[in-house]
Structures are given as structure tokens and as C-alpha cells.
Amino acid sequence: MQSPYIYPQEFDVIVVGGGHAGTEAALASARMGCKTLLLSHNIETLGQMSCNPSIGGIGKGHLVKEVDAMGGAMALATDEGGIQFRILNSSKGPAVRATRAQADRILYKAAIRRRLENQPNLWLFQQAVDDLMVEGDRVVGAVTQVGIRFRSRTVVLTAGTFLDGKIHVGLNNYAAGRAGDPPAVSLSSRLKELKLPQGRLKTGTPPRIDGRTIDFSKCIEQPGDGMPGGTAGPVPVFSFMGGAIPHPQQMPCWITHTNERTHEIIRSGFDRSPMFTGKIDGVGPRYCPSVEDKINRFADKESHQIFLEPEGLTTHEIYPNGISTSLPFDIQYELVRSMAGMENAHILRPGYAIEYDYFDPRALKTTFETRAIGGLFFAGQINGTTGYEEAAAQGMFAGINAALQCRALGGLPNDHGGAWLPRRDEAYLGVLVDDLITKGVTEPYRMFTSRAEYRLMLREDNADMRLTEKGRELGLVDDARWDAFSRKRDAVSRETERLRSLWVNPHNLPLAEAERVLGKSIEREYNLLDLLRRPDVNYAGLMSLEEGKYANPELAAEAAASDDLAKSVIEQIEITAKYAGYIDLQKTEVERAAHYENLKLPTDLDYLQVSALSFEARQTLARHRPETLGMASRISGITPATVSLLLVHLKKNLWKNTVPLKTTDTSTEKAQA
């Protein structure tokens, strides 16, 4: 038997998988100065959009902006590859406005790969990983399918849908990580040997259509913002650095609809659907259901919107968003052709469902390091999430914490205690991480603005103001981004103070002008910042008062010249002024909750001995072992009364200095089983 080959170079961080989580993890740890190896089964698929050709949306766009604010790649790659951009909820408040882009798959993937190949401290290697090197209770490297052993201090596993993946089309199924790629069966088996809590989930994708066979004249055209027929104004950008990058040619999408005949065709295939015949065990995403699931659950609905989305500028391939399916191909063929404009549609690729392993994120530490194996981090769909954006955010988070752990292990300066943990009031990423590790998942998790209780503070527009300084501290943000951010931050501060210092005297303000700009006359002096807080008053109107007396000539000139910095400064000032009262209330709530939120629970506290709690609560807490009282409060089944009793118990026993500790018997382990 051939002896294993040990690669001569050792690494700080090995990232397994080159999808959206893996690429952001590898880029983050490399930017922080760690020697990073990215292992992918195929270098040609780095950054591949496996399902829909779009980035962003409600909640998801917020995550993309946060990744970008800390120097990540997703937003910049989307700006380079985006062929349609829209601001969703543009008529609503700023907390729920979100950017969404259609992307050219080829351009997006090329943009990601270029960043990977040009990132210092980052090495790429093409080989599937079959095993992990574990010594004691710590990971020390990874083993590829041909037996090459790479040693490292930490490993970030971002396996996507590849772990024991199985594709279903009708009653037929076969092993695959996605269409055209093999599954990671050996790695899945190895992880199961490590006794990590595991389950099965499923997701799906629709059949792809040749656009030359679609009659778009029978469909409704949906242009993007800044396109003819779309919302007026410039085409949006995703990245805070994206203004300098020209978007490629912009393209419309189209809308068609299912109908009663479509629904009859779908129902006729229920007896051969893997979903309804028990062939699929995994639970699918609630908010991106298959078309057969929609027709079954909403039987009274006569029609569903289907969005026809172009896959790119150099292909005729169309992604019909809304008909993800695992029905037999003959049913897919008929249902596609039953919709308006699709009567002669040719399917290029059949739709399918894919089932895969995930691991319970409640078994992770707050850094996404597994509790069972030191140095092993999970990110992406392996944690039970769905979506490119959720994966990218997790990847960056895991990459940061793997790098921080390497710094600590190497005795390097580390101001973050070996971990970076954003709070729920700091970032959507904080909400995502906290939800996963405290609540776990019973279905693929996706982000929504409704999941964030402090969403007025966590807007897309201020992601850089919230996170770029932290990114700079961590070593993630380069000089160009830091300079751009500093100019914006300083300009916002200067202009805010200028508005606060300028006063409008009612005696000098003509009634007609007051009514035009302010909606009514004023009876006393106001500074401009206070006037800007009024709902119907805007910055441009204030600058026009008294023949432009209060205007900032420099900022006005930059805004008139379509300067992105000037516009973002004005937007930031307007939003902050108008929502200052509400934001202050949320900050008060955060401060009130902060003490108990961050109150550390003893790591050796034996919950089964806390007699004041119900037996169910004791079992739940023993199983989850939350790190703080705040985390305990968000565990499913833990009531406010339980939290109060736990707090009383902690105070009482802290005073007595007799907090009951875990005993050496197996009672807690039995409760966890």
C-alpha cells in the first residue's frame, strides 16, 4: 500500500469548497494575513451560481452589503456581472429597502475567480476532500481523494449540497452534489463518524429554457431600475466601492403565469413525485417551495407568477423563477408549455430536487467552530441555510474566526480575544449567527428583515457605517476602501454639524417658500437638521431656501455631477435625521437588554440540578448549553419566566458561591441524547 503524501507546506486555514461560503471564507482569512488553502473539486466552478442567477433581495441584500462593508467580494462581483438591478420596497421605509440584481453567471464567476487568484496569502488546489485529519479532539488538516494530506491549524468546511447529495427527477434518483458534479460521500461518512448531530434537507431548481423558443410578446416585460420603462434614475450599485465599476449591458426580465391547465398537469404527476411518494426525506425551503408544493398547499389559487430571468449576455438560456420542480420530465415538459409565451418552449436542462446532509448548527460555538472538534468550522448550507447571500455571510464570518484562532495559536497580537461576534443590533450577520446557534433549523433557513428586531438600525445604506471600521481593525479592509469610507464618514459628520449650526428665521422666510419646502410656515427659529426631521422635507428643498443661502456649494456640485459619494452622504444624513427618534428608542432597548444579553452562563453549570426550572426547560438548556443569558432566552421552548428563574438562581448561587456544577455522572449526557 502506497504511503500517504504529506504536502510540504503547512497552512493556517484550509477552506473546503469553492462556492459562495468557501470563497468569502478563503478571501477573509487571507486578507487577515493567514496562509490559506482553498480546496475545490473543480477550480472551474469557483463562485458558481448553482441555482438562480440573482443576488440580493429582502434581507439577503442587507447581508451582501454587510459582507461588502468588510471587504468581501460578492457585491463587487455582482456589480461587474449584474445585468439588471432593482431596489425592492423603494416606496417603503429605508429599513426594508433592498437591492436585488440579476447576474450574468459567466461574468460573476470570472469576477470571483480573478479575486481569488490575485489575493495574497491564498493558494488554490483542485482536489475533492475525502477525509479530515484529526488528532485527539482537534482537526489538523484535510485529506484529498488521491491521499494528499494538507496540514493546517484550522479547517473551514463549506460543502454546500455535496454531502451525500442525491438528485431526484420523478421516481429516478442518482448520487450528485449538483447536476454534473459528484457528491462528497466519503467526507459525509467521515463527519458522521465524528458523532456530529446531522439531518437531511432538500432544495430544488427549475428546468432551464431556450429563450429563442419563448414568445416574449405574450409575456409582461420587467425592466430594471434605470432602464427604459423602469424606475427613473441611475442603475443601482451593490458595493460601497461599486460606483467606479461600469455595469455590463442591462437586460429586462419577463413575467408569465401558471393557469388552471398548468395546475392540472402538475397534479397529474403527484403519484410520481418524489415529494409525495416518500422518496425524499429532507425538508425543503418554505420560502422557495417547488411548484408542486405550491399547487398542493394553495389549491384555491388560480395562478402563480413566473419570472423569466436571463442567465447572461452570451447565452439564450432562461431561468424560470417559480417552477422549481422534481416532477418527472414528461410532466415538466407539459407544464412549461402550458404557460403563455411558452407554448413552443424547449427545455435545455430538466429541473430537479437535491437532498443533502446538514449538521445541526446548535452544535456549533458562537464562532461557528464545532464543539466536538477544535479548529473545525462550518459555514453555508452545511449549517442548514439556503441562499448564496446567507452562505457568503457565514463564510466570511467563519473565515474571520478561523483566522483569529490561528493568530491566538501562533501567539500573534489579537485584540478580539480569538473571536469576532457581531451582536443582533450590529448586523444582520449577527441575527443569522444567533438564530442558527440558538434555535437551530427544521427547514432551510433564509434571511428576512422581519427576523431582525433592530432592523431600523440595520439598514442597507449604513452597513459601511456599522461595519467597515471593525473590518479595518480585523485586517479585512484595504487602503482604497478605508479611504473611501473615511471620506464618506467625515463628510456626513461635517455636513450634519453644518446643518445643526444653520438657523432659519421665520421673519426672513417668505410664506410661499415655507409652504413649498416645509409644507407650512414656521413660527420660531429652527436649525436645518431639525427641519430635515419632518417627514415631507428633503435635503434638496432645504438647500433651495432663501435663494440657496444654506447650500453647501462643494456637495451640491458633486451631487450635480452624479458623484456617488455626495449622494450617499446626503442619503445618510436624511435617513438618520428622519428616523433619529425611532433609532434612539431602539438604542435604549439595546442598552436595557445588553446587561442580561451578555451575562455569561457558567460553562460547567449543571442545568439538571436547577430545581426551580421545569424538567423540560432543564433538559432543553442542558442540550443546548447556551453561552449567555441572551442566547438562552432565544432558544425555542424557553419562556421569559424560565429566563427570570434562571437569573434568580444565578444571583442566589453567585452570592453563596455555590453554583451547582456538572457532576461526573452521565445525567447531562443522557439529557442531551
Curated annotation (Swiss-Prot):
Binding site for FAD: G17, G18, G19, H20, A21, G22
Annotated localization: Cytoplasm
Pfam families linked to this entry: GIDA, GIDA_C_1st, SAM_GIDA_C
GO CC term (a single one): cytosol
One Gene Ontology biological process: tRNA wobble uridine modification
Disulfide bonds listed in the record: none
Matching PANTHER family: GLUCOSE INHIBITED DIVISION PROTEIN A, PROTEIN MTO1 HOMOLOG, MITOCHONDRIAL
Stated role: NAD-binding protein involved in the addition of a carboxymethylaminomethyl (cmnm) group at the wobble position (U34) of certain tRNAs, forming tRNA-cmnm(5)s(2)U34.
Protein name: tRNA uridine 5-carboxymethylaminomethyl modification enzyme MnmG
The organism's taxonomic lineage, starting at the top: Bacteria, Pseudomonadati, Pseudomonadota, Betaproteobacteria, Burkholderiales
